[in-house]
Amino acid sequence: MKIPRPLPADLTSKSFTTQEALDAGVSVGRLRYRDLDSPSRAIRVPRLETEHAFADMVRPITQVTPFSAASHATAFLLWGFPGFLPGSHEPGIHISRPHAMAIPRRRGVVGHRGQFFEDEITTFNGLLITSRARTWLDCARKMDIDEITVVADHLLRIPRPEFEGRSSPHCTMDELEEMLDRHWGTPGIRKARLALEQACVGSDSAPETRLRLALKWAGLPTAEVNVPTELSPGVVRQPDLAYREQRVAVEYEGEGHSDPEQIVRDIAREEDYSRAGWILVRISKGHMSNNARSAVAKVRRALEQRGWSPK
């Protein structure tokens, strides 16, 4: 039986729109699994008894292995991290124990051990698990720098209380930096440091982070990320990326933008930008293939139309 990838933690115990899920990095295919009810178009409600099946598989293993906690790829999945972690869906439950204990050895288990500070072990649905910050560091060894940044942006993102029921980010920049300082010799830490240097607080989704990084690596100017921008008196928009000097806005549009009501809102948004003399660059999943080559070209053309040129 194929186990569905766990939803982001913020979506596991409440109804949500498909756009909220897509913005959180959930795939369209994941939204079709039978563990999600659809009481109305574009609405999903988790069937909690099924949604927690993965945690229920992990919990007994940690219970019979003293001083252990879910970690590495298993914690990555349980926390619902975005980003590509090679091997994350391979068989085997990852658990860790302190250095002083033996490495866990049990059929179906991938054992680890390491140094753990008290605040690096927490609980998830009654299951002992490495904290989000520690999980981020543990998984950095296998990830590339940009994908580590995708996870860092997810942890640093300021949530929307009206939709997510929380007002604080999962982690602060200081907390992630402290995690690196504590474990300065651990494998992958150099990549994690480089990733944290290019992380930002404002990115709302994994595709937005990948787009921002692709534009950076292409040598385009640095954009403001999800900053409210007054287009004209009384008209404020919050583009995913804004080049205020060139009056160019960039929006990444997930599949939820095909909804008829969303199309109407998108047209109104584009009209606002046009009336204010801004260029709105709309990016979709199709533009992100081949290292976002098409997306970079679209943004570059818009900037050049406004007089920007490479130095």
Q: Where is each model-derived feature located?
A:
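Surface segments flanking catalytic/ligand-binding clefts of nucleic-acid enzymes
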Residues: 9, 20, 25, 159-311
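Short gly/ser-rich loop at a beta-strand->alpha-helix junction or flexible surface loop bordering the NTP-binding
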Residues: 1-188, 305, 309-311
